[in-house]
Amino acid sequence: MKALWHTLWQGQDIAVCRDSVEVDRFNAQQIERVLLLHRGTGDSPGDVVQVVIELTDHCLVFSADTGIAGRINFERQSYWAERGCVHWVNIARAPLPLRLRTGHGLLRLSPPPFARVARADVAGMIAKWPVQGAQTWDERKRLRIERAQPLSFEHA
């Protein structure tokens, strides 16, 4: 039977659980940057495939199935807006070490739902990613709506 991974807020910490047993925990104040890796344009919450959270010495890599994207996009929104640390990257332009990569089509890779890796091991790769943001989900949605609006002219 497949293990059930999930994340949840506990005070100022985010706990990572496997089958309801806590396996990791980190304080949200330690987060330096959140990278939401998405397919397509990233305009839908379902486009987020993986999340990389950069701490001082480690990177935490989550699959979307853990619910971490929901913790970032829809819970404590004012906290994330104030922090200005949420960024977006198209997954096609965001290579990770093979064991952490997700895939589709003929290349169906199955990365672990959660991994804590030394930041030094992935920093060189992440530095080359074309990062967008900082912007929360609400800011991203608002920009998408504005881009879809026909040009409007104000009359003096």
Predicted feature residues:
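Eukaryotic intrinsically disordered, low-complexity regulatory linkers and tails enriched in Ser/Thr/Pro
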Residues: 1-156
